[in-house]
């Protein structure tokens, strides 16, 4: 009987299966004994048929012939702290060398593709599985999903591809993976999962993503999409050529250390503004090792179906390079940096229209195109119709825009009509807020009620002369009644209702405002009831913070659980538990050289690593709440990174994805390219109904695959308008200025800061002395700072 072969150094331990894949990769001092690669044993135990996707397996198409690592038993040799795995296909040989002895504390992985013939071979597809432990375990012991699973944040680059596998607890150490030789095209993902949503069990979803590193191709023959940013080419392997790729794996504690260790491996350390507004200056800073210098930089963008370029100004001061330019076109911009050794790096930034215009166009589209009116089926609904409360988020966005921006009475009244004539009778028998309808066969979802409560609360914010069916005070009482139904287990008869009512949700966004208004209107009994229920819930969540019970929802691990928990605990000023859940948020929000890959980690709506507009935005909102309480700028920066990706779902000027009509929006952006489950969805925006044709649960959730792709959008933008929709932050870190949600220009005596907020109200200055609200200047869209440069 053969056994796995082991190599180790002082920090890492690795085992190679006799089949040639990495069966174990672990940190020696890890108290949780996490295996950083997906295990064949777990796949078998959970019933997943994916043993062909384990770390180190590969697929290659050479001269149109498909081969893979499972066809032959490899030759495996060990010498000291090095293992060599060789696959010999006759005309080609693939050699993988795993070396733990080159630099203590690191794994060095070399891949050789050798042409053994005296003629060229065309490689149209070559991908190697790098299946880090991106797993949502089917385990109600949520600590397993926190301490033994990782999010994977990747940066694809010509010569500097890297990723960080981030343990979900954000405390136990992460694994960085850096390219140090060769060129990778992309990292794709394959998703496998089990979803028992309709079987009335909770949690009902588990699954995993397998990551695949591509050196050639990745897509079906002849495949085309709108993505002009990333390569999909094959390459010619010359006669007797030995083409080589090298990677280094090491341990880091956080994002900063991940980037610093990259710098030591000659990776440029690039900081950039993920979201930019047309006409304002876009900025990057680049720190490099002593051996590198920047020769030039340019911004590539697509205009009228043609990729164009714009020169980027490069200055060197303060031991780093400062790059800046003013974009002249809307859409994605690929800023390419060329170095003195012939290598290249790049970042992908977005350039959007003014955001108040984006929101105005979106709200007009909702009211003009999606509102069904009296003759609709059902009457007064907004398309697309759904039983899930998330579908009402667009109504809340309409109301919020009309509270902060220009008032359109007709828009408000359409929403009011829908709330009274469609929402109330659909979700509640005879409109009685104590009698929820079982819209899902034999159960209802308590989570639906938090969106309805918010809807009624926002209606209560309008003057009575704007409303036409009921008074603002009536809507306030309705909001309180629905909120109580959402959080009071005693109002539910079945176990599912009692259990779900005690789960946190998006209502943390408006709970404080609701209480304040109830107090103002002297609705004392309702206020006290809700306050008491809230206090009980928060005490329970606070006491149970060590077990992280709130991280489980309908899914075995969910940012829709720990995000609201962190936000709500911050609202309740429970510092210790807010910090605990806050760590899960920091480990959940990505960082990358592509603004679209900085999303809060989530996969099930897209079957890929993705930006999910609703829960990306609500996770960003939760991080913002934590920042507001703890004053830790990591949460502020994470919240804004996530927000930039969410706004991409509303961007009708994007050029690298399927275009949208003015005012349209799409709930999901799949980060992966390729999306191996559905290559046609690679690096594109779409709604979940796109999976209808695949059958299974999606055929039960949706009526067809042409339903509008924005069914669950809106609540996240309502949350955005309460934070970055109005606020801009200026961070002075030892004389280096950074603006979150804005841009700056240098003046003779300081800086002029311009906000990107659609309804700019407040500028905050953050330095070693703390955070200060600056005095309002002019129209509130900009401030001048008189500080020494």
Language-model segments: residues:
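Acidic-aromatic substrate-binding/catalytic surfaces of carbohydrate-active enzymes
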Residues: 2-86, 136-139, 143, 147-153, ...
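Extended acidic/polar, glycine-enriched regions
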Residues: 290-358
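Short Pro-Gly-centered flexible turn/kink motifs
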Residues: 235-253, 774-787
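Low-complexity, acidic Ser/Thr/Pro/Gly-rich terminal tails and inter-domain linkers that flank the onset
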Residues: 83-103, 253-273
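Terminal, non-catalytic domain-edge segments
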Residues: 256-276, 532, 536, 540, ...
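Acidic (Asp/Glu-rich), glycine- and aromatic
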Residues: 88-92, 101-162, 343
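Low-complexity, Pro/Ser/Thr- and charge-rich linker/hinge segments at domain boundaries
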Residues: 136-140, 261, 266-281, 344-380
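Catalytic cores of extracellular degradative/oxidative enzymes
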Residues: 354-624
């Amino acid at each position: 009987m053969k056994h796995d072969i082991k190599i180790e150094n002082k920090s890492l331990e690795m085992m190679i299966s006799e089949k040639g894949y990495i069966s174990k990769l672990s940190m020696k001092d890890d108290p949780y004994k996490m295996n950083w690669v997906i295990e064949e044993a777990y796949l078998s135990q959970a019933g997943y048929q994916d043993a062909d996707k384990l770390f180190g397996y590969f697929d290659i198409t050479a001269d149109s012939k498909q081969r893979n690592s499972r066809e032959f038993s490899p030759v495996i040799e060990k010498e000291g702290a090095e293992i060599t795995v060789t696959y010999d296909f006759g005309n080609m040989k693939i050699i993988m060398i795993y070396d733990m002895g080159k630099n203590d504390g690191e794994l060095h992985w070399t891949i050789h593709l050798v042409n053994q013939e005296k003629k060229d071979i065309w490689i149209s597809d070559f991908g190697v599985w790098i299946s880090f432990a991106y797993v949502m375990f089917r385990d109600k012991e949520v600590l397993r999903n926190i301490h033994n699973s990782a999010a994977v944040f990747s940066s694809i680059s010509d010569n500097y591809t890297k990723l960080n596998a981030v343990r979900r607890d954000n405390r136990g150490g992460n694994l960085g993976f850096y390219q140090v030789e060769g060129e990778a095209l992309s990292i794709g993902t394959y998703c496998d999962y089990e979803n028992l949503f309709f079987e009335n069990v909770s949690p009902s979803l588990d699954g995993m993503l397998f990551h695949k590193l591509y050196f050639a191709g990745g897509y079906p023959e002849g495949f085309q999409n709108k993505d002009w940013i990333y390569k999909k080419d094959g390459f010619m392997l010359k006669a007797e050529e030995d083409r080589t790729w090298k990677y280094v794996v090491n341990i880091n504690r956080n994002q900063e250390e991940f980037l610093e260790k990259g710098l030591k491996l000659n990776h440029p350390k690039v900081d950039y503004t993920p979201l930019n507004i047309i006409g304002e200056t876009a900025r990057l800073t680049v720190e490099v090792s002593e051996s590198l210098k920047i020769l030039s930089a340019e911004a590539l963008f697509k205009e009228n179906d043609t990729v164009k370029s714009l020169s980027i100004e490069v200055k060197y001061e303060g031991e780093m390079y400062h790059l800046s330019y003013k974009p002249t076109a809307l859409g994605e911009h690929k800023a390419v940096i060329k170095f003195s050794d012939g290598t290249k790096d790049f970042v992908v930034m977005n350039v959007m229209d003014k955001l108040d215009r984006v929101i105005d166009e979106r709200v007009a589209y909702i009211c003009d195109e999606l509102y069904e009116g009296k003759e609709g089926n059902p009457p007064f609904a907004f398309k697309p119709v759904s039983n899930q409360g998330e579908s009402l988020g667009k109504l809340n966005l309409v109301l919020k825009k009309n509270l902060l921006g220009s008032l359109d009475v007709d828009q408000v009244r359409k929403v009011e009509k829908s709330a009274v004539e469609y929402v109330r009778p659909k979700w509640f028998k005879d409109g009685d807020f104590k009698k929820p309808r079982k819209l899902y066969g034999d159960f209802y979802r308590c989570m639906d009620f938090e969106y309805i409560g918010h809807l009624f609360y926002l209606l209560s914010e309008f003057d009575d002369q704007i409303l036409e069916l009921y008074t603002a005070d009536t809507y306030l009482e309705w909001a309180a009644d629905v909120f109580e139904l959402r959080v009071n287990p005693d109002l539910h008869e079945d176990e599912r209702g009692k259990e779900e009512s005690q789960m946190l949700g998006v209502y943390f966004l408006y709970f404080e405002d609701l209480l304040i208004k109830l107090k103002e209107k002297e609705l004392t009994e309702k206020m006290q009831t809700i306050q008491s229920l809230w206090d009980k819930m928060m005490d329970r969540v606070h006491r149970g913070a060590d077990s992280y019970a709130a991280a489980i929802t309908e899914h075995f691990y969910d940012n829709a659980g720990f995000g609201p928990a962190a936000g709500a605990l911050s609202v309740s000023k429970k510092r210790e538990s807010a910090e605990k859940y806050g760590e899960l948020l920091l480990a959940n929000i990505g960082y990358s050289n592509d603004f679209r890959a900085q999303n809060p980690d989530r996969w099930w709506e897209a079957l890929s690593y993705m930006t999910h507009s609703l829960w990306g935005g609500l996770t960003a909102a939760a991080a913002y709440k934590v920042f507001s309480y703890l004053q830790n700028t990591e949460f502020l920066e994470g919240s804004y990174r996530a927000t930039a990706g969410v706004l991409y779902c509303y961007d009708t000027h994007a050029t690298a994805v399927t275009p949208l009509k003015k005012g349209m929006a799409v709930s999901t952006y799949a980060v992966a390219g390729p999306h191996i489950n559905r290559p046609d969805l690679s690096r594109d925006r779409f709604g979940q109904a796109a999976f209808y044709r695949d059958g299974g649960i999606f055929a039960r959730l949706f009526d067809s695959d042409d339903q509008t792709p924005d069914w669950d959008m809106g609540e996240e933008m309502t949350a955005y308008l309460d934070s970055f929709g109005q606020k801009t932050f200026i961070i002075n870190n030892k004389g280096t200025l950074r603006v979150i949600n804005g841009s700056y220009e240098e003046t003779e005596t300081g800086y002029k800061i311009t906000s990107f907020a659609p309804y700019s109200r407040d500028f905050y200055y953050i330095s070693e002395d703390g955070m200060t609200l600056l005095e309002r200047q002019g129209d509130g869209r900009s401030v001048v700072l008189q500080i020494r440069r």
